[in-house]
């Protein structure tokens, strides 16, 4: 049996969980390939029997991840599992992803989600879930990977009763994120010496080689281009949107985490009194770049 994990990770949290799951699979079956979605040739997936898919939850499955899944060829009679990371409310991801994978003929044999820290310019810093993933989370991911191998083997052997029910879809979302309106200050931009925003645009809609540069005002949004720009050439007015997001964090996200904590699904590592309600991420990290991409993630 051959296994592969494909993943998207913006801040590195999902990557950590993916590699931990891979470790569990490796211990159970001796091998497991792992590939970020940016380096994936979807045609290669036909050679695998067990396929894992990991991603953060951005109000559900991120658009560019969904777009990639839709390009996967038919994979009937093969097994899949999926997992996500999130900062409070990840409940939409798994029902959506399971259905995307099932449309490709895959049998989904397991799902999992983890609370992780959040690097979002409008979210308070420190944040409610900071400190995750920790060693306990990583061990859980390793155990999850090992479990997926065991279940896959047994399902292939005929124990189809082990296949979990398809998680129900939630009602249409009423929550929407503020639309990220940005502009490029060409006087500050270092292109062609720097092309970080273009290289790491999730939707591949930035093209600085054109004259004038192709730089859409609105997008997914992931905010990554603004976070990684070394000179602050990507400009955005976060003030009013940060107030809205802080309000949601104080109410909706806090309530969701309190409920999860009471049910034993969330371990609080950052006390509420330590949360930076007055310092959204963009104020906590005032200088540019606000986030530095680790060297080994530069091609992801």
Q: What does each model-identified segment do?
A:
Residues 165-191, 198-202:
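A mid-sequence, solvent-exposed acidic-amphipathic segment
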Residues 23, 43, 98-99, 199, ...:
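Surface-exposed charge patches
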Residues 191-214, 220, 224-242:
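Iron-sulfur cluster-binding cysteine motifs and their immediate structural context
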């Amino acid at each position: 049996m051959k296994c592969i994990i494909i993943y998207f990770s913006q801040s590195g949290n999902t990557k950590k969980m993916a590699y931990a799951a891979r470790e569990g699979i490796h211990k159970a079956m001796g091998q497991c390939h792992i590939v970020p979605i940016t380096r994936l040739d979807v045609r290669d997936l036909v050679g695998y029997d067990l396929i894992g898919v990991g991603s953060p939850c951005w109000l559900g499955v991120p658009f560019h991840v969904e777009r990639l899944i839709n390009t996967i060829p038919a994979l009937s009679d093969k097994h899949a599992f999926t997992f996500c990371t999130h900062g409070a409310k990840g409940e939409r991801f798994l029902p959506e992803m399971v259905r995307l994978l099932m449309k490709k003929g895959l049998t989904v044999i397991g799902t999992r989600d983890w609370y992780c820290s959040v690097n979002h310019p409008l979210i308070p810093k420190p944040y409610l879930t900071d400190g995750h993933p920790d060693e306990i989370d990583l061990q859980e991911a390793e155990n999850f990977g090992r479990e997926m191998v065991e279940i896959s083997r047994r399902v292939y052997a005929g124990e189809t009763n082990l296949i979990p029910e398809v998680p129900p879809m939630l009602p249409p979302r009423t929550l929407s994120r503020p639309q990220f309106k940005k502009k490029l200050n060409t006087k500050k931009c270092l292109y062609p010496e720097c092309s970080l925003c273009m290289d790491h645009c999730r939707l591949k809609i930035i093209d600085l080689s054109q004259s004038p540069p192709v730089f859409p005002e609105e997008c997914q949004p992931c905010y990554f281009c603004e976070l990684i720009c070394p000179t602050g050439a990507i400009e955005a007015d976060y003030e009013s949107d940060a107030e809205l997001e802080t309000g949601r964090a104080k109410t909706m996200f806090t309530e969701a985490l309190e409920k999860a904590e009471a049910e034993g699904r969330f371990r609080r590592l950052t006390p509420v009194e330590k949360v930076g309600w007055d310092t959204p991420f963009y104020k906590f990290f005032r200088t540019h770049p606000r986030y530095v991409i680790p060297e080994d993630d530069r091609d992801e």
